[in-house]
Swiss-Prot record:
One of its GO terms (molecular function) is GMP synthase activity. GO terms for cellular component: cytosol. HAMAP family: GMP_synthase (MF_00344). Residues 208-400 form the GMPS ATP-PPase domain. It catalyses: XMP + L-glutamine + ATP + H2O = GMP + L-glutamate + AMP + diphosphate + 2 H(+). Keywords: ATP-binding, Glutamine amidotransferase, GMP biosynthesis, Ligase, Nucleotide-binding, Purine biosynthesis. The active site is at C86 (nucleophile), H181, E183. Pathway: Purine metabolism; GMP biosynthesis; GMP from XMP (L-Gln route): step 1/1. This is GMP synthase [glutamine-hydrolyzing]. The gene is guaA. InterPro entries: Class_I_gatase-like, GATASE, GMP_synth_C, GMP_synth_GATase, GMP_synthase, GMPS_ATP_PPase_dom, NAD/GMP_synthase, Rossmann-like_a/b/a_fold. Its EC number is 6.3.5.2.
């Protein structure tokens, strides 16, 4: 019998902050399971979830507006600790008898708060001391409204000159509110505060660890599918790879992985996937060479969105054909992760989230009645990677830069041709190889090469040549919602350019993309 790793859990109510998923990831990093729900949950849903504590997230709305979101009143009647962050603090204050006003001064960015009263939330936590020995905390503010009167049974714990109630607390009820964001790294002691709330005040044990998550997932897979056969579309990406390893551990040869080689992968990627999962780990893999089929479907198409749809449609067709060849397969496995689940819930309820969903296998033939196995659906991407390491997958594969689902189909601008893909593969491999050699690969968030369908004149020896252009792209980002172009050293860029032009016959010019996001997107298409 595996340990119940969901026994202690935190409920996070989402009021729309761009940082809400980060709050959830921080709680998970503390070894405690949590779920992220929309703010308007019912009392019955909260009771059913049975949280050890509740966090109210930040949000973009103003609590002073008539129809702005409010926490369900049951949150404050459930008898569990409650932690309000930014907007969450403001709605807590208003709902419990305090007062919030729109402020003339927006407070955004770094601030230093002074701790004026003792509280379990910040006891012994400090970044510096005032002249008279009071603790100071470096925090990250992002708010327009501010609490101007706290509920009568609360005390002021910390303040700034412009924010008299930066932290408030009712120690008896274990209710806490902070006007800053403890989840961001700019709040230097933020993790300590979250740990104090989750581990000490809510008394949650650290049961949510990679090894225990694996044991739990394996037990659940076995319980769900029994001795039935399962099919999985293996792409070689992080999510499908970790899904494959979990399923293989749980059901062994009852798993069949279908690897569709669409001709749009990175250099030698198909061989690497087959070697690692087939030869090294011993998984049962069906290899489908489908390059010609994908390229013929893409012939003549220049529109990026149309190309994405064609690649998705052909993949589903190929996968379906392979699935129909297999006998007695009862289950389809997918590498759905928790942000995909959140996105689906947001779409269903009409509530906006900032996550761009990725799509897995998609439709199956109507004649195939299969159940769905999604062993990663409770996990964030960083958790999936940690589990992959625990399962023996190589670090370089798990922590590689993101690669788009349509692959080189959206990195070859305009029409996709085999010649263009082959040139791009080789150029991109040189760029990535040089980044690794210069110890720059892990210092940028994403790096890749783009094929431009334009010819440029060049000189080789005594002759002129008229060949293709590629652009190098490297960005630095925390959340991929915004990004800065990476300031790579000029001598490094020169070395990459020289290698590509000299070693890849057919490319005569290399440029470097210095566009940020916004206004540009990270990918060109």
């Amino acid at each position: 019998m595996t340990e119940n790793i969901h026994k202690h859990r935190i409920l996070i109510l989402d009021f729309g902050s761009q940082y809400t998923q980060l709050v959830a990831r921080r709680v998970r990093e503390l070894g405690v399971y949590c779920e992220l729900w929309a703010w308007d949950v019912t009392e019955a849903q909260i009771r059913d979830f049975n949280p050890s504590g509740i966090i109210l997230s930040g949000g973009p709305e103003s609590t002073t507006e008539e129809n702005s979101p409010r926490a369900p009143q049951y949150v404050f009647e459930a008898g569990v600790p409650v932690f309000g962050v930014c907007y969450g603090m403001q709605t807590m204050a208003m709902q419990l008898g305090g007062h919030v006003e729109a402020s003339n001064e927006r407070e955004f960015g770094y601030a230093q708060v002074e701790v004026v009263n003792d509280s379990a939330l910040v006891r012994g936590i400090e970044d510096a001391l005032t002249a008279d020995g009071k603790p100071l905390l470096d925090v990250w503010m992002s708010h327009g409204d501010k609490v101007t009167a706290i509920p009568s049974d609360f005390v002021t714990v910390a303040s700034t000159e412009s924010c008299p109630f930066a932290i408030m607390a009712n120690e008896e009820k274990r209710f806490y509110g902070v006007q800053f964001h403890p989840e961001v790294t700019h709040t230097r002691q933020g993790m300590h505060m979250l740990e104090r709330f989750v581990r000490d005040i809510c008394q949650c044990e650290a049961l949510w660890t990679p090894a225990k998550i694996i044991d739990d997932a394996v037990a659940r897979i076995r319980e769900q599918v029994g001795d039935d056969k399962v099919i999985l579309g293996l792409s070689g990406g992080v999510d499908s790879s970790v899904t494959a390893m979990l399923l293989h551990r749980a059901i062994g040869k009852n798993l069949t992985c279908v690897f569709v080689d669409n001709g749009l992968l990175r250099l030698n990627e198909a061989e690497q996937v087959l070697d690692m999962f087939g030869d090294h780990f011993g998984l049962n893999i069906v290899h489908v060479p489908a390059e010609d089929r994908f390229l013929s479907a893409l012939a003549g198409e220049n529109d990026p969105e149309a190309k994405r749809k064609i690649i998705g449609r052909v993949f589903v067709e190929v996968f379906d054909e392979e699935a129909l060849k297999l006998e007695d397969v009862k289950w389809l496995a997918q590498g759905t992760i928790y942000p995909d689940v959140i996105e689906s819930a947001a779409s269903a309820t009409g509530k906006a989230h900032v996550i761009k969903s990725h799509h897995n296998v998609g439709g199956l033939p109507k004649e195939m009645k299969m159940g769905l196995v999604e062993p990663l659906k409770e996990l964030f991407k960083d958790e999936v990677r940690k589990i992959g390491l625990e399962l023996g997958l190589p670090y370089d594969m798990l922590y590689r830069h993101p690669f788009p689902g349509p692959g080189l189909g959206v990195r070859v601008l305009g029409e996709v041709k085999k010649e263009y893909c082959d040139l791009l593969r080789r150029a991109d491999a040189i760029f990535i190889e040089e980044l690794r050699k210069a110890d720059l690969y892990d210092k940028v968030s994403q790096a890749f090469t783009v094929f431009l369908p334009v010819r440029s004149v060049g000189v080789m020896g005594d002759g002129r040549k008229y060949d293709w252009v590629v652009s190098l792209r490297a960005v630095e980002t925390i959340d991929f919602m915004t990004a800065h172009w990476a300031h790579l050293p000029y001598d490094f860029l020169g070395r990459v350019s020289n290698r590509i032009i000299n070693e890849v016959n057919g490319i005569s010019r290399v440029v470097y993309d210095i566009s940020g996001k916004p206004p540009a997107t990270i990918e060109w298409e």
